[in-house]
Amino acid sequence: MDFVVDYQTYAMADTAAPELPEPEPRLNLTSDAQSQPTGILDLQFKLPDLQRYSNNNATLPVDNDGAGSKDLHKKMTHYAMSSIDKIQLSNPSKQLGQNSQDEKLSQQESQNFTNYEPKNLDLSKLVSPSSGSNKNTTNLVLSNKLSKILNNYTLINYQATVQLRKSLKVLEENKERLSLDEQKLMNPEYVGTLARRALRTDLESQLLKEHITVLEEFKPIIRRIKRLSSSVEKIQRTSEKLLSNETNEVPTNNVVLQEIDQYRLKAEQLKLKKKILLSIRDRFTLNQVEDDVITNGTIDNIFFEVVKKVINIKDESSFLLTLPNLNAGNALIMGVNEILEKTNKKIFNYLIDFLYSFESSSNLLNDHGTTEQESLNIFRKSLVFLSSDLELFNELLKRVTTLRSKSILDEFLSQFDMNSTTSKPIILSAHDPIRYIGDVLASVHSIIANEADFVKSLFDFQDEDLKDTPISILQQNKTFLKGIDNKLLNDIIQSLSNSCRIRIEQIVRFEENPIINFEIVRLLKLYRVMFERKGIQDDSSIINNLKSLEDISKNRIIGYYEDYMKQTVMAETKNSSDDLLPPEWLSEYMNKLVELFEIYEKTHAAEDEESEDNKLLSSKNLQTIVEQPIKDVLLKQLQTSFPLAKKNEKEKASLLTIEINCFDLIKSRLQPFEGLFAQDDDSRKITIWVCDKLKEYTKQMLTLQIKFLFENTGLDLYSNLVNMIFPVDSVKDELDYDMYLALRDNSLMELDMVRKNVHDKLNYYLPQALTDVQGNLLFKLTSPMIADEICDECFKKLSLFYNIFRKLLIHLYPNKKDQVFEILNFSTDEFDMLIGIDH
């Protein structure tokens, strides 16, 4: 920096200055008189005394002694020429042509100044125009001089030159920051001098400050040296004393050595103690960086590493409580608890902020530049660490439940907004209630599916998320954390249970059609299963509401048939059925039952896993809609329609006919659904009871028709008499007829009496017996199979008795066989042919 200040030496200073100050030795700008021999001085050119010429306006001699002249311009010319000559001398390796040209130029300039004539000078031209030219020449010369100095690597002080170059380079690089005015600094006038001095002052002040700072840093070192100097000197003296001892034997009673040994042992103990304390400090305390991470750091993996260290400190500090003095352990545990409380609150706030911004965040990167997957991993890890504080963790779950419950409830209710422009609203239609319920349940299922995806994306913990978790947290909360997503989902969905139930219940409670109600039951059951597959627990409120709605629909189905029996059937009881066909209400009722059974069988597999009480067509409900209407309504109505059936056999025949028709209708309609009634013993008893009743009435009808046949043929009296002694059906051979020998003494068995009672009736009725039975009475049975069965059985009984009775008379009156043939004049074949029996 010396050159920066000494640059003023070459400026155009005032001519009143006595002498031009010499530059610093570094520039090596010694005068011609100092550096060159006298022979060279004779070659210097001389400038005219322009001032004297201008003042005296006369011809004056020119002073050729440029070096000794006090004129500023002459001195500048002298130094310029000296510099040029020195440059020429220092570069002898230049080409000869170049040197000759420089010498010619020097000689020409010298001759010009030597041959200078005052008469040719014009003061105004010499002073004014030439002053700028002289300055430019001077600056050019100085610039060349400076370049030569900076590029001269042959100088002795090479390091100083390098440092100078670096200093100038530093100034050039920091020109803008230091607000350096290059033009002002390079100005050769007084303004430049002031600027350079100011720059030097500033640089020296800054350098002085830095030196002072360095010296201040040495103060503690010096103080420590002064403090330890006495001990070091003592050790040095002792060591010199020991080394001066020529013998290797050291006396055992040397107090100094014993003292040194004690100090050495004490020093080792102190080192060990220090090492232990440092280890304890590193293990049970946080450094400044870790404390800053806890206080000011963001929630990331580094933060969790620090929290993990704090938890480990808490877990490992329990041994301090076993010490006699519990202060250290209590203080450490209290400090750790405060840090954990602070971290848990910070994690809690982070989780709340994350939840609020998760839905609205459309960018895959958050404010800290982490990806969405990394953010989710940090979120789960935050939940794991927060689970150690149950109060804050439960508060977080409540916040999440409240936030998401409100969100999904608003979304669900918006589906019913008639003024909504975003989506088509769900409209209740009286013509299609099933579609309305399906839309409601589909909307709920969509919300549950979306919410399940949302919850599982945040709260579904995998083993990978728990691998870096402290053991103390895993032992307490691992099982709980793995099921937190389902628990949270069920808590959130509870907000939809009442709103969903209200909108479905208004349809279920007022729907009367059992088929529609059954479709509603199927729909509710289907979505209940779908909800459970999405993670909704079977004991949650929304599932319980769906079950209650199912029960309401099932009760409405059963109630419909009960109401039908109470209302419709009561109107039918006032009219008796003259055609002996089943009443119309029974046919309609069975049609409705069959329609229900048909649609039920299609979905019967869906109820296999349900309990008996929850089934729609359980044994209890089947008894209600099948057995009870028959017992309590149908049979009572038939008894009411034929009040004389017990006294009048024809009335009884009509009653049996309509009963057979009714039970045959019931059996035929229920027979395709035997599998439905075979689910348990109680249900199976219903169909068995119907079949038994039909058989019972058929048997009664058969007995009654046989009685009618025997009465019409006149054989009824003899049938009773013969069967009283020995059943006709039991007669197998001729010996069995001996059982009837006692009948000879009975007057009714006399042939004349038999002729009187049987012959005319038999001959009159037998030809028309088949037509009478089939046409007049059995024609009213709706089942041809039952009618044929009764008819065939009646005539078989009649044919059997006629054949046995004829043989019995022959056996009783073997001598009157012709008379017997006259009374019972139809042979067996003829008799069978007339009544339509085929053998």
UniProtKB/Swiss-Prot annotation:
It comes from Saccharomyces cerevisiae (strain YJM789). Keywords: Golgi apparatus, Membrane, Protein transport, Transport. It is found in: Golgi apparatus membrane. It comes from the Eukaryota. The lineage of its organism: Eukaryota, Fungi, Dikarya, Ascomycota, Saccharomycotina. This is Conserved oligomeric Golgi complex subunit 6. One of its GO terms (cellular component) is Golgi membrane. SMART domains: COG6 (SM01087). GO terms for biological process: intra-Golgi vesicle-mediated transport; protein transport. InterPro entries: COG6, COG6_C, COG6_N.
